[in-house]
């Protein structure tokens, strides 16, 4: 999978309206490390380093984050339909971004608002779920549905009162998900936030298999599953918040990719989580290449992931629903 990701990584730099030969591409990318004589034009360097490199890196980061978050949530809740938006993180991010656009904030503040509201949404879910009676897992799922619906209603109201000429189209486009106009500052923000969520998740993957045990079995082994579950939820939430805040709503990646990864390496989280990260990065990179190459006008990436992910998930259900 790493070789596939590398091939797609290089292919992404070649695709585009401005032609950059592969030989020149490699020289441009390596010129920052090695002293290479310049044989490329300044326009080639701008296209590769300022336009395509940030976008390619962000596609890899977002795909990796969403897939890792989906794997974490599916393991915690023991639910094959669990996705990164199960606790309302995506709905909260949408409300934050829509509010920032409505109030005329800069692109940086749109990302900050989306990230903050995403964390706020999950905090409310955990607050409600932990104080309700009954099963902790079921309470979190129900609270996620309710809080997500509340934030979705807030987003709908913001769209209703937004200026239909300028603000509403911008809100709508953000909600459809896109990686266009990515800057290195955005990539840096995403990388730092995602590292905060991904590193603990990778360190915990040896223990995540224990979440499949019953409460009595875990207690007999002296394992605090509540603490482990909370740590995984927090890590997956930070990953989801970071991904959605910089890319908008991109669905199906965190739902489909973990299932495909299980088909390849099995259910052991020690191998499953790294595979999901690589697979997710490669998948979103491929879809982003399609988004900017299929038509003259760029297609929002959230639309393409739905077109690709939904039919493929149906195929998985038909061919082996008992293995989902």
Q: Model-predicted segments: where are they?
A:
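Alpha-helical transmembrane segments in inner-membrane proteins
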Residues: 1-324
């Amino acid at each position: 999978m790493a070789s596939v990701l590398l091939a797609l990584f290089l292919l992404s730099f070649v695709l585009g309206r401005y032609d950059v030969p592969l030989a020149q591409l490699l020289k441009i990318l390596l010129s920052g490390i090695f002293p290479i004589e310049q044989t490329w034009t300044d326009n080639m360097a701008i296209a590769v380093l300022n336009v395509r490199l940030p976008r390619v890196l962000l596609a890899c980061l977002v795909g990796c984050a969403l897939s890792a978050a989906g794997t974490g949530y599916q393991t915690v809740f023991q639910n094959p339909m669990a996705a990164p938006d199960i606790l309302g993180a995506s709905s909260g991010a949408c409300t934050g971004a829509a509010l920032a656009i409505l109030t005329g904030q800069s692109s940086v503040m749109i990302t900050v608002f989306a990230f903050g509201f995403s964390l706020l949404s999950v905090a409310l879910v955990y607050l409600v779920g932990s104080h309700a009676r009954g099963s902790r897992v079921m309470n979190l799922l129900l609270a996620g549905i309710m809080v997500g619906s509340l934030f979705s209603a807030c987003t709908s109201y913001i769209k209703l009162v937004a200026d239909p000429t300028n603000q509403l189209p911008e809100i709508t486009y953000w909600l459809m998900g896109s990686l266009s106009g990515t800057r290195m500052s955005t990539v840096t923000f995403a990388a730092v936030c995602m590292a905060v969520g991904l590193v603990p998740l990778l360190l915990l993957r040896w223990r995540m298999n224990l979440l499949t045990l019953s409460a009595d079995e875990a207690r007999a082994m002296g394992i605090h599953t509540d603490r482990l579950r909370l740590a995984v939820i927090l890590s997956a939430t930070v990953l989801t918040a970071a991904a959605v805040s910089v890319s908008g709503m991109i669905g199906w990646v965190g739902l489909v990719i973990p299932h495909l990864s299980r088909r390849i390496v099995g259910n052991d989280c020690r191998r499953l989580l790294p595979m999901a990260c690589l697979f997710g990065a490669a998948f979103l990179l491929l879809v982003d290449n399609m988004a900017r190459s299929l038509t003259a006008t760029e297609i929002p990436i959230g639309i393409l992931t739905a077109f690709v992910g939904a039919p493929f998930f149906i195929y998985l259900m038909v061919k082996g629903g008992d293995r989902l």
